[in-house]
């Protein structure tokens, strides 16, 4: 399945929820879902009864789009989560949260996960002192993500770090803004994920 390259705001309207795909725009009145809180398309404002399967599918699509994951990779994450100890749905969210691109976004180095993914791919970071360019890499407690010296003058990164206060940083991460450095203090817990996600619906979908 190819990666979606169309309007990001259209995805938010389709899922009926803010996915925060457009960075700072999502926090302003320009946010599409604040202006038109109904699905896109000719019949977007009509009322359509959705089946249980449809509800489960929409939830899966919503989470997949929040984190920018393709279907095959997302299914792989679910299978990994299902083999782990604990609650499968929560395990899935923890795997997604521990992706390196998500951590870069959570720390405020980028205004969106897509932007963070590009920064990682282009080699702007080091992890524990070594250059890294794999967005899907799973971080662990004690890992240190730092912006490389030559990247610290990139205006977009500096502006994003200045605006991170509005978004907030999860308890399991710590940012040293002056050092352009973030530390993974612990593994995420369910309470750290404040987005309106019903992960059990995804478990039910894949368990059919």
From Swiss-Prot:
Pfam families: Ribosomal_S4 (PF00163), S4 (PF01479). Coiled coil: none annotated. One of its GO terms (molecular function) is structural constituent of ribosome. CDD domains: S4. Residues 98-159 form the S4 RNA-binding domain. One of its GO terms (biological process) is translation. Transmembrane segments: none annotated. GO terms for cellular component: small ribosomal subunit. It comes from the Bacteria. Keywords: Ribonucleoprotein, Ribosomal protein, RNA-binding, rRNA-binding. NCBIfam families: PRK05327.1, rpsD_bact. PANTHER family: 30S 40S RIBOSOMAL PROTEIN, SMALL RIBOSOMAL SUBUNIT PROTEIN US4M. One of the primary rRNA binding proteins, it binds directly to 16S rRNA where it nucleates assembly of the body of the 30S subunit. Belongs to the universal ribosomal protein uS4 family. Part of the 30S ribosomal subunit. Contacts protein S5. The interaction surface between S4 and S5 is involved in control of translational fidelity. This is Small ribosomal subunit protein uS4. It comes from Geobacter sp. (strain M21).
